[in-house]
Amino acid sequence: MPRSGTTLTEQILASHPRMHGCGELPDIAMLSRRLGTDDPAALRWPASRSLLAPGVLRESIDRYLAAATRHAPATAERLVDKEPLDFLHLGLVALMFPRARVIWCRRDPRDIAVSIYGENFALDEALATDLPAIGHYIVQQERLMRHWQSALPLPVMECRYEDLVADVEAQARRLVGFTGLPWDPACLDFHRSDRAVQSPSRWQVRQPVHARSVGRWRHYSGALGPLLDVLALSAGDTTNPQASTPSRWTSGA
């Protein structure tokens, strides 16, 4: 989800001398719309998978890699695409890049919702400005990610924002290890990087890690009833894989 720690996660990984942070590339979503046919009335991906003409998938892979590597240094062995809405297209990603690895950034959904609500996102108006709609989207994102975990061969690592800011070195080592590259201490100096960051968190990643945004939703708890109602209707692990009971995330605790 947007506002779940994707920028911090990318900044840590992109500080590794053998990785390149691509930012939020629109190419996977664009390829998903384009694949299969140019007829707007015909089947769209993934229903159009069986209609793929020979060479179309290879062309799509080449097109994506051209965009992803446009500014990558010659030393880059891993590419990090932090587009959060690519979770919608992981089936296509698995087809294009069967050796890809997925980092699922997790965060208290109440903090995600408050953060989205407070940003001027160029998203669907309801998603950006309606708390119940944001809550519903968070729940459905969780359901789809659980589906991908069971249906796709891609390895998925869950990285919780709260764990990351509580012990950045331990989680950074975990992240780098997941990519298959050796640890490099430069990943802890991510806030000194001069790479361009275009997300709303661009100023936060110029500072050392802090936990000031954890539990920020509590400042607005009196106005979050509709959001909490939506989250309370979800399954017990939908909003926090480590919570023992649903109430931990849907009550005022």
Predicted regions and their residues:
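Phosphate-binding active sites in nucleotide-utilizing proteins
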Residues: M1-F97, R101
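Short alpha-helical
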Residues: S4, L85-L88, D111, A166, ...
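Short beta-strand segments
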Residues: Q11, G23, R78-E83, R101-R106, ...
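Conserved nucleotide-binding/hydrolysis micro-motifs of P-loop NTPases
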Residues: P26-I28, P109-I112, L164-V165
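PAPS-dependent sulfotransferases, especially Golgi type II membrane carbohydrate sulfotransferases
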Residues: A42-L51, G55-E77, I116-E158, A166-A253
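Conserved phosphate-donor/acceptor-positioning beta-strand/loop module used by diverse small-molecule
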Residues: V93-I116
